Amino acid sequence: MIYQSLFSHQASLPSEQLPFTVILLNDWGLIRVTGKDRVKYLQGQITLDVPLLKENQHILGAHCDPKGKILSTVRLFHYLKGLAFITRKSLLHDELMELRKYAVFSKVEIDIAESTVLLGIAGDQARKVLKNCFEKLPTETEPVVHEDDYSLLHFSSPRERFLLVSQAFKEGDFLIQKLQDQAVFRSSEQWLALDIESGFPIIDAKNKTQFIPQAANLKALGGISFTKGCYTGQEVVARTEYRGVNKKALYWLTGKACRVPDVGEALEIQMEEDYRRTGVVLAAVKLQDGSLWVQAILNHDFQKDSILRVKGDENGRLMISHRSFKKFEPSSNPIA
């Protein structure tokens, strides 16, 4: 990409403070699934009811291991002449190997789309500015628009934003060149902050095979079908649901810490004069005002005003954000 040097690393901003911004999603990647059996094959692999996915939809689900634990989250949509999903770059090669395990028995090809460009567009007046760049924009009711060389995805949470998926650098470079004098250019950490704010679970390599989908907010987001047929891990996911034995949940924590914690670090909760372990960090970003956002999966047997910290950080103080994640409305998503 010609303009890659424009995307500087800066402390992130909350969605309500974000100016018009273009974000290079270098920490995400794309896997393409093509071939005659692509729908049938993915139907047996992920938590989504794949045959119900329309051309103008995208949906977040999970690919699980046989124990029902998440190998990766997948943002699934139709792309070019097949299906594709966005996942974290740290998981791309592991995910490719897992998906290919049984592909020899099906007419399907699965590959990492190495040359694909992922650009996030967010912030103030995003739709107004993009109207001058694209003939048609996606909406909340039609969240994917396809053209010959690209697909454009719409997100309504935490505020309206877009994701450009281009099969070649030229579309991304064209957009950047056109917006160079209007936009702020940021690294992928800003998109990560927006995903934390939205309650979209961030599963990286350090946390794969640790959590069931319900613990990662995917049921609330409509990312698990309980009516489709079998898929890898389905028995465990269904049994957990119907027995009500899931004891963990996804939380958005805000506060301060001596440093930005690493993915997979432990969190502790204050219990009178002491602390005990309660969960693990999925993602964390430092904001421009010096505060810290942490996405974590925690045991949910505690008061919502509890004080937490990164393990061993004596001066740290984190609390559950007062802003709730957007919850799934069954009528709005027919494919889960």
Curated annotation (Swiss-Prot):
SUPFAM superfamilies linked to this entry: Aminomethyltransferase beta-barrel domain (SSF101790), Folate-binding domain (SSF103025)
Sample GO molecular function, one term: folic acid binding
Cellular component GO terms held in the UniProt record: cytoplasm
UniProt keyword Metal-binding present: no
Binding site for folate: W28, W191
Main location: cytoplasm
GO biological process: iron-sulfur cluster assembly; RNA modification; tRNA processing
Annotated keywords: Cytoplasm, Folate-binding, tRNA processing
Cellular localization per UniProt: Cytoplasm
Annotated function: Folate-binding protein involved in regulating the level of ATP-DnaA and in the modification of some tRNAs. It is probably a key factor in regulatory networks that act via tRNA modification, such as initiation of chromosomal replication.
Family assignment from sequence similarity: Belongs to the tRNA-modifying YgfZ family.
NCBIfam families, sorted: PRK09559.1, ygfZ_signature
Protein name: tRNA-modifying protein YgfZ
Organism field: Hamiltonella defensa subsp. Acyrthosiphon pisum (strain 5AT)
Lineage, highest ranks first: Bacteria, Pseudomonadati, Pseudomonadota, Gammaproteobacteria, Enterobacterales
